[in-house]
């Protein structure tokens, strides 16, 4: 935190240092703005204050770092804080199928603390979404192995299959499930 807290303090307390920094970094670009914390937002504001060249990219629907201090309010209140900013809302999803985009819209629209927007796609419906509620990590691993077996039976090569998981500890049950099913894998 000191890597941000100390520069913020210096810029707030020393106008000469702030002016030098603002002239050195005339353009401030921030990606994943929805995941910035209070200090990061203050630093951006201090640096951009003179030249008003602040460019941020973010999606309030994808804010995931609240647990480590990110303030989604930074993106939700951006237009209030910077009333002369131009906002470009990107609603077209070029990667996902219609089924996935529609499901995502249905889930996220229930969040009342967000800016209104609705994603669209030109892609076809695609495969139906499958939700499986496993009773345990082992049950989940068995189900995943079964689905991979079905894919392989229908011609999918093992190297064309990927399993994504959020944390490393989840890999143990998956590895055991794949080993038990005789499915080759690389971690």
Name the predicted role of every residue range.
Residues 1-77, 90-96:
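Conserved helicase NTPase motor core
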Residues 83-86, 91-184:
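Helicase P-loop NTPase motor core
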């Amino acid at each position: 935190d000191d890597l941000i807290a100390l520069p913020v303090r210096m810029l707030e307390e020393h106008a000469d240092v702030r002016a030098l920094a603002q002239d050195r970094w005339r353009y401030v670009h921030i990606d994943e703005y929805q995941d910035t914390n209070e200090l990061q937002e203050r630093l951006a504001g201090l640096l951009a204050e003179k030249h008003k060249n602040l460019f941020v990219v973010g999606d309030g629907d994808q804010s995931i770092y609240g647990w480590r201090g990110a303030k989604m309010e930074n993106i939700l209140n951006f237009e209030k804080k910077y009333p002369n900013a131009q906002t470009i809302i990107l609603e077209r999803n070029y990667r996902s199928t219609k089924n996935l985009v529609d499901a995502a819209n249905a889930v996220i629209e229930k969040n009342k603390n967000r800016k209104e927007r609705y994603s669209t796609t030109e892609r076809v419906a695609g495969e139906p979404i499958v939700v499986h509620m496993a009773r345990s990590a082992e049950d989940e691993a068995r189900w995943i192995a079964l689905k991979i077996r079905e894919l392989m039976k229908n011609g999918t090569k093992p190297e064309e299959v990927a399993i994504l998981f959020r944390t490393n500890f989840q890999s143990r049950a998956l590895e055991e499930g794949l080993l038990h099913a005789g499915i080759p894998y690389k971690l």
